[in-house]
């Protein structure tokens, strides 16, 4: 379908329905989302502040944790504008180009999260398998290079996404059954040949999530082998405890991702509310849970929090 200027038709705005079956503008729904955002933002800002001010946390593990916290803030802020406007102000229209920008940032931050979790697994691998070389292997320059590499890889991989979407005509309406813009939802209202989009999306998922998760599993296989060599059970438990926070963070991220991918690929007839709720889980739960997981499971973080409050009271 062509517009008046001879270019493929694209709606000026897209309408976001929020969660199908739940009316937008309801106070209790808005309150839930505000609480989720508050927990995520306050929790991740607290992690960043704690690592910055506490000298005992100036170690590779906590630098990677800071990257994770910063990325989780990016995930939260990339969805916040449309979610808040939809549920708090009952305004559910977003400009088409703004929707593409939001889609790009949501997917980019999600891919960066996967890369950071891989870097954190490598950190645990070096710490447990080569403890005497830990500081010399993971220097500040290498950590910075890893962070920039994750950013560059995610940005360049996702950069073509808005353009391969924008080339399509949109003639199936302008309604997205979501509270933010995602690539699969845009494909449902697009016309024309979407094979390029689907193939590119699948390759990107395999190249990013597939490879990252494979290397994370490989890292933990090598860690497990190293732990079995340790004679002392106390040392084994200590080594395992240093990995528990990261394992929980990996599960909180990858389990919803796998569930969403399976639903989109193999259960396309699922009610819209199922797709929306699962997408909300994978975008809202990890940024909210990660600060809690590391605060509960990491002794040094707990000590840092107590020390910070003691200083504040003094």
Swiss-Prot record:
The chain crosses the membrane at residues 28-48, 57-77, 102-122, 142-162, 199-219, 240-260, 276-296. Its main location: membrane. Residues 1-27, 78-101, 163-198, 261-275 are extracellular. It comes from the Eukaryota. Keywords: Cell membrane, Disulfide bond, G-protein coupled receptor, Membrane, Olfaction, Receptor, Sensory transduction, Transducer, Transmembrane, Transmembrane helix. It is found in: Cell membrane. Odorant receptor. This is Olfactory receptor 51I1.
